[in-house]
Amino acid sequence: MKIRPIKVLSIVMYLLTTSLSLADDVNYLREAISNTAESIVEGRAGDTDDMLEYLQNARDYAISAQEKYKNKQIKIAVYHINWAINHADENNLSSAMKDAGLALLHLKYMIR
């Protein structure tokens, strides 16, 4: 069986483009997770209005990552962020911080 250089080159190019797009996806996911975690931490440090704004930003980042990757940990983090927003909206900051912390915990598993 004769191996043609063009065939080998096309396979190598396919593998390179696939690995590059995978690297872009990984970078996007890391950035989305980092932005989500940063928004949660900033929200936990502020007052109720700031917390709501940062948690809503965190939810937006997490939802965009969830839509792209369909990952269970991100889905659970979105769930906890939604609960944190509900608690912050009711001025129950301790419960909001607890749920924000749980969201961070689930996002931590994604960073590994």
Where do the language-model regions lie?
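Long, charged/polar, soluble alpha-helical segments
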Residues: 20-112
